[in-house]
Amino acid sequence: MEAEDCTVAVSEANLKDLLLALDVGNTNTVVGLFEGDKLRTHWRLTTHAERTADEVGMWLHQLLRWDQVRVDDLTDVAVSSVVPPMDPRLAEGVRRYLDKEAFFVEPGIRSDMPLSVDAPQELGADRLCDAVAAYAEHGGPCLVLDFGTAITWEVVSAEGEYLGGAIAPGPGVTADALSSKTAKLPSVAMEPPPRVIGKGTVDSIQSGLFYGYLGLIEGVTRRMLDELGDATVVATGGLAQAFASHTDLIQHVEPDLTLHGLRILWQLNRGEAG
């Protein structure tokens, strides 16, 4: 399964917009620069929740300089964050150094996607971005898996209604717990070993983690498809390609799905459509 470019058309009026998009996760922050609907470049950086507003602002300013973008040419800044303590400092850093009031994905924004869940205000920003982007690109019904610090599943109906999903600890969380809670088991890279039956400690751990998670992924996905019926299955996140190459359930791998969802939500709320 090859990674795909997720590009959703926008109005001609927005083709020259320069949007800086920040997907702030618990482990990594992905920063993307959009020119209209095209992702011009992106950077993946470690998330540091204790960053000050000045650090955030200088950090973003330097990324723009690296890509030879003048601050005055930037149209706006959009943020999807699952690290609430960072949000005020992100907003202040953007205000001071980029002279913008950042758009945040938060409860109450326009998404054009009905949220048929018990507590819509609790839906994570990244999960909404994933659902919106997958539906815009593939229509519905669709099911999205995002491999991050947590693994999330998002389900969207044929009519574009968000139906809910599931959340499980990600492979990295489990691997860290295993090495930190045991005296003799080492930390290992999350990758498929050469065989399922391990011949040593490292490949035995890799087998248990990788194929154990593969079973989790396939099990939850199949049960969701049993409830939903046939659907397009899309994966994103750091380990999406690795797992997609070992299962026939995942039809599309789109590494930049969350950023594209953030772009779409920004356009609905502040762009030409807003």
Question: Language-model features: where?
Answer:
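Short, well-ordered amphipathic alpha-helical segments that serve as non-catalytic structural scaffolds
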Residues: 55-67, 216, 220
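ATP-binding/phosphotransfer module of carbohydrate and carboxylate kinases, centering on a glycine-rich
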Residues: 2-10, 15-21, 174-274
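Glycine-rich phosphate-binding loop of actin/hexokinase-like ATP-binding domains
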Residues: 44, 140-176, 232-233, 251-257, ...
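Short glycine-rich, Thr/Ser-proximal phosphate-binding strand/loop in the N-terminal lobe
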Residues: 2, 8-10, 14-62, 160-187, ...
